[in-house]
Amino acid sequence: MKMKKLTGIVLAAACMVSLAGCGSSEKKEVNVEKPEDLKTLTIGVQQGTTGDILSSDQVEKDSQMKRYPKGSTAIQALKNGKIDCVVIDSEPAAKFGEKNQDLKIIDGVFETEEYAMCVKKGNTELLDEMNKALEELKEDGTVDKIIGNYIGDDTGKYQYESPADVDHSKVTLVMATNAEFEPYEYHEGDGIVGIDVDLSRAICDKMGYDLEILDMEFDSILPSIAAGKADFGAAGMTVDAERQKNADFTDTYANASQVVIVRK
């Protein structure tokens, strides 16, 4: 009799665990059409990015914000049901979408933003040099070709290479970036590649500098430039009023927007 009772208790406990497991695996339907719809959601972002800033303005309490060092870590948390959605830039989102067919991208929630590179506040000499080079690269079509090599129908058709007669007689410029933001900067093999990498190299070629890339956390880029550890930053960085307090920005070179990623 005691054995039967014990068996019954064990079976009942197993059923309860099973039901609890089933309950936790149920998908929560998330619909987002405007920023205000994020108010009660648990949101994953890459720390310090525009997605972090915009989402933080919408939630009821900061504990709803789950900040990760990499966008890919936020995506994994979403797939595991730890968060309701991820807010991130549109192009990296597209890359994540290609690799994760169980996710859905919702666009049109936020307004379009502009990307630029940044230099130490007050370093007008370098800023003017970079803007001049960037203008020339826009005029001769190099910027469009570099972006097209990573986004759109011409992907892989134009890989930027430094001209054979390029003069790198000036000092090396150090570029601060966060190589977790495909297609703008990401790891491939033993190197770092992407739109910002190719464009920075093209700008340095125009100015007569060699290029060194320093990979770091996204929210360390501006402090590193301010401290003189890097000369400029390029990391799919949106120009906004808060960042302009701490750095000067070049002319813009790309447009993007924040999107919301949810489970299907």
Predicted feature locations:
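C-terminal motif of bacterial Sec signal peptides marking the signal peptidase cleavage site
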Residues: 17-21
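Extended ligand-binding regions for polar small-molecule ligands
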Residues: 23-24, 49, 116-156, 198-206, ...
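Acidic, polar ligand-binding/catalytic clefts
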Residues: 26-37, 100-111, 121, 201, ...
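Bilobed "Venus flytrap"/periplasmic-binding protein-like clamshell domains
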Residues: 27-69, 90-92, 177-183, 192-205, ...
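Beta->alpha turn/N-cap motifs
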Residues: 46-50, 70-71, 86-94, 140, ...
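Ligand-binding clefts/hinges and TM-proximal coupling segments of bilobed small-molecule sensing domains
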Residues: 53-65, 105-109, 134-170
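Extracytoplasmic small-molecule ligand-binding "clamshell" domains
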Residues: 58, 64-67, 76, 85, ...
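Periplasmic-binding protein-like
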Residues: 90, 94-131, 154, 158-162, ...
